[in-house]
Amino acid sequence: MAERRPKKTESFKYKITFKKTGLSRFLPHHNMLSFFERTFLCAGIPVKFSEGFSPKPKIVNMGALPLGMETYCELISVELLKPLDITPENLPNLMKELSRPFPRGMEIVNIEPLKEKLSKHFPKAMVYRYTPEAIPADLMERFNSKTFPTVTNHRGQEMDLNQHVLSIDNQEGTLYIKVKCNDQGTTASPFVIFAGILGISIDPAKLDEVSRRFLVAKVSMEW
């Protein structure tokens, strides 16, 4: 009986780190994943599909980014039917080739073998960057004394910013804030957090408009 079972096709799993900057930060989540499927197709590298009535490419990310936010450390996993040559000598050329079909500002910055599913290892915190027009003189005092306000997110839920902001680093007028992740590896909206700690009035229900006014970037993740 065992011989009658169809043999499983060998596959190769990779973790890909990429960035989205400039106008590509407005690329919707679904379109972004489609670009990855397309770039492997253009390179002649077949992507493995799921089985069943409606097969889908085995490309997985860690959740949709807020529209309009830059990222320098976004992750996806992909399962391929052909191995990639990711030796140190070939990796730069491979990343350049695979990034070629992407819109300007979107680029692969690393490829490595996937050791475990992304859902098995979520980040503990994320670091966001923003350069405001002005920084309140008492910002660090309020952080240290845990007197940041409670604000409302886009779902109408209250958020105590003191429970979310883990650290603040002011580097010549550019703020880097470390924000705690939930158990799914995501954080509260950095737009809402920056607005709250800086005393900027925004409508959390209209974050698409807010993202056009504030250039916030996700620069790193901590595990």
Predicted features along the sequence, with ranges:
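Short beta-strand-to-loop capping motifs
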Residues: 18-20, 78-86, 130-135, 177-183
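Ordered, amphipathic secondary-structure segments that act as subunit-interaction surfaces
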Residues: 71-127
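Core RNA-modification/binding signature centered on pseudouridine synthases
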Residues: 8, 142-223
